[in-house]
């Protein structure tokens, strides 16, 4: 490709409304342009990267035995009514009527459509197992789209759905998809971690997320220092204390704490050990009989709302109770709440159950109890794992301790079981002629999100540093004063021809532009390998080569450059 015949569209200035580096660089590198909130057009450079990501995803899915199909983005609402998600999904589901007043949705996901397709097309166990995938546009009407392609309303996704009669083949397909996703991200040259995950709104049993590691990642990953164990912070299991509860050494006493509205203020003002304090959080209960529930964690710990969401007593999704409701029921407000004398159900974290001589709110404004001990001052409450893990704690596999990393979720695989097939009556006849409900798996990759995540992991102050496999161009040719030197023109054109014939994606900057601008553009768009051609190089019989990632420069003799670049591009 010649720059003179290409829409390069680079920008010097960082757009003011772009918050994260991937959004900034995708705009500056001329990859995307905003059409409306959360909606973007791909320019040539961005589309080249997107198509390379898509190609790797497609190749690995095909290798894993999945079959490509394509389903409509527009879906009939009656399928969503059938599964109950018409009401459950919320405002992210964009609903509309056609000219005949029939309800439709713009698909944020395709479980309903694929299940409807399979129940009509598959009738016998002989047709199973089956794994179908598509690469299709999705639309989710996010309340606040942000971070460019990281959280846009319209995005490109690979979603696959598998169908089975038995758990064994479902497990085999799940493992195949796990391996395929690992291969996809490995081929793209990205540092990543597969992690145990919560099944979320889609539901099901087993679930793994695939995270590209990046400091800007929204998700916190807890992983073992001694094994492959890793989990999303929402899913990571807290260790059950092995040490017995300590004996009481303090008397219970009521203390005035007028200026201690938070744990931090309480600890500072009274010189307390934060591990000897607890936080009492009041959430909405699951029934009229238990309208409020108290969840108690240690002062230095954080409530894990995903874990709390699974408690029978707690309404789903977890909702913090309004202060007015708390005051009406307890007589005090947040900052002064605690377990003694509390007339609502209490659930405490495992770590709280072994505490002694601890401090908590007294359920009277501006007062706390110090020296609280279980059994002596109040009965032990229901115990559960309801907190986030912290670094240094032992991991559940016993092979190490927790460490933390930030990640960007780009893939998610689920075992759905019969969540959709049962509600949609997707059945087949087994070997005995008996009707059986299908088991399902679901496997998603955010194709457009991978592009943004790759940038978040690979950039410097000059621009993007693309991994080889997904770079828009592998080699950039920079001819100095090309329009004034026939020698430079001839050699640049010959190299351009040779690289094209070798099947290498190459960008020849044939503009009448200053060298500084040409260098800046090549570095901004992240081309891995750059070759500079000038009269001085020609006199010396060498090309000047620069590696974008390492910054290393080399002089390569004319007759060695093509082989050198072929090897460099292969990695």
Curated annotation (Swiss-Prot):
Catalysed reactions, as listed in the record: tRNA(Pro) + L-proline + ATP = L-prolyl-tRNA(Pro) + AMP + diphosphate
Gene Ontology biological process: prolyl-tRNA aminoacylation
Assigned EC number: 6.1.1.15
CDD domains reported for this sequence: ProRS-INS, ProRS_anticodon_short, ProRS_core_prok
One Gene Ontology molecular-function label: ATP binding
Alphabetical UniProt keywords: Aminoacyl-tRNA synthetase, ATP-binding, Cytoplasm, Ligase, Nucleotide-binding, Protein biosynthesis
Keyword field contains ATP-binding: yes
InterPro entries: aa-tRNA-synt_IIb, aa-tRNA-synth_II, aa-tRNA-synth_II/BPL/LPL, Anticodon-bd, Anticodon-bd_dom_sf, Pro-tRNA-ligase_IIa, Pro-tRNA-synth_IIa_bac-type, Pro-tRNA-Synthase_IIa_type1
Subcellular location: Cytoplasm
Entry GO CC: cytosol
Domain of life of the native organism: Bacteria
Gene3D superfamilies associated with the record: Anticodon-binding domain, Bira Bifunctional Protein, Domain 2, YbaK/aminoacyl-tRNA synthetase-associated domain
NCBIfam families on file: PRK09194.1, proS_fam_II
Swiss-Prot/TrEMBL domain comment: Consists of three domains: the N-terminal catalytic domain, the editing domain and the C-terminal anticodon-binding domain.
Purpose: Catalyzes the attachment of proline to tRNA(Pro) in a two-step reaction: proline is first activated by ATP to form Pro-AMP and then transferred to the acceptor end of tRNA(Pro). As ProRS can inadvertently accommodate and process non-cognate amino acids such as alanine and cysteine, to avoid such errors it has two additional distinct editing activities against alanine. One activity is designated as 'pretransfer' editing and involves the tRNA(Pro)-independent hydrolysis of activated Ala-AMP.
Oligomeric and partner information: Homodimer.
Record family assignment: Belongs to the class-II aminoacyl-tRNA synthetase family. ProS type 1 subfamily.
UniProt name for this protein: Proline--tRNA ligase
Organism: Shewanella baltica (strain OS223)
